[in-house]
Swiss-Prot record:
(S)-2,3,4,5-tetrahydrodipicolinate binds at residues 133, 142-143. CDD domains: DHDPR_N (cd02274). Its EC number is 1.17.1.8. NAD(+) binds at residues 7-12, 75-77, 102-105. It catalyses: (S)-2,3,4,5-tetrahydrodipicolinate + NAD(+) + H2O = (2S,4S)-4-hydroxy-2,3,4,5-tetrahydrodipicolinate + NADH + H(+); (S)-2,3,4,5-tetrahydrodipicolinate + NADP(+) + H2O = (2S,4S)-4-hydroxy-2,3,4,5-tetrahydrodipicolinate + NADPH + H(+). It comes from Mycobacterium sp. (strain JLS). This is 4-hydroxy-tetrahydrodipicolinate reductase.
Amino acid sequence: MRVGVLGAKGKVGATMVQAVEAADDLTFTTGVDAGDPLSALVDTRTDVVIDFTHPSVVMDNLKFLIDNGIHAVVGTTGFTDERISQVQDWLADKPESAVLIAPNFAIGAVLSMHFAQQAARFFESVEVIELHHPHKADAPSGTAARTAKLIAAARKDMPPNPDATSTGLEGARGADVDGIPVHSIRLAGLVAHQEVLFGTQGETLTIRHDSLDRTSFVPGVLLAVRKVSERPGLSVGIEPLLDLT
């Protein structure tokens, strides 16, 4: 399988280039960065592209890849419901193309989201705290937003979080994602971390995941690269690849 990387000179992208080059069953074709022509992916007969770029360019990248029949594994964040809908519309005209978008490729992070979804209905209160390096463009993170949505869906028949706050500074209680408070921290020295805090009578439960290095994303990305062509259309998350759905 011939694999290219968009954002190849970025910190995550460079890690992905090394991972593809080290894999015996994959061939690295080309790396594309800002200012480079996307046509290089076609010229090198690339089968699958790994995209770790920026929310401002990822949609143009996807339109090009879909139009040219190149499968995409996307770790770039910033996907709103509207963006997801747009990708689905593009894919409707290219039924042979496959796009997999995941808010997080770290296996532990995916498992922590799954565990949080399972725990959600057993606790009265829940809040999410995500912590990242200060260069991250979006807040809350895609992982935190997805975690909150999964928790909210699991709690759909439960009362809302108890919270008597009536006054306070704007933003002090975090962002509201489907009724779940999500707090974002940006701090030098961090990579990617998340805590989900549950509370009920007499006890609390914390589910925490830490990506200490960007290589934590490699196993999930390579799994997606190897499997994406088997799932035409749009897939969100790698949970199905791990038999978690």
